[in-house]
Amino acid sequence: MINFREYSNKKIAVLGLGSENEALVLWFANKGVPVHLSIYDRREASALEDKQEKISHLASGLSINWQLGRKSYQSLKGYDELWRSPGWPIFCPQIQEAIHNGVVLNSPMNLFFELCPTRNIIGVTGSKGKGTTASLIYDILKLANYPVFLGGNIGVPPFAFFD
């Protein structure tokens, strides 16, 4: 099980503010983990006003530095960890340089797998039909009276299932 004190006062860069990383930021705030976050997103501030307002309100206890726009991620130096969203290319030079310099690369899904109370997890990958396939699996298991949750990029971030 994860020890949240390990994250105390760490400098963490959140790469991409999709639904998974947004849920991750709010989850860290709800746990009261005093981290120093920099949120990077290629979109301009005007496109993220609602998310910024929501996070600033709900995660007011966190130290957050917003780095928005295409040029915002020129360097990812000085962080303890990078939390990459699935849409952020793992082989971009900035991430590779950070990894080379000892920065830990992580993702919300890694943390979800670590915290999930069961190991009975079904993952669906691929480029076409993930939502349909995952929904069918969910419906079949639900009809068979299994306790089942459906989450991921189909609408509900995995962290929504934790308190």
Which stretches of residues belong to each language-model region?
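Phosphate-binding loop of NTP-binding sites
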Residues: 29, 74-77, 86-163
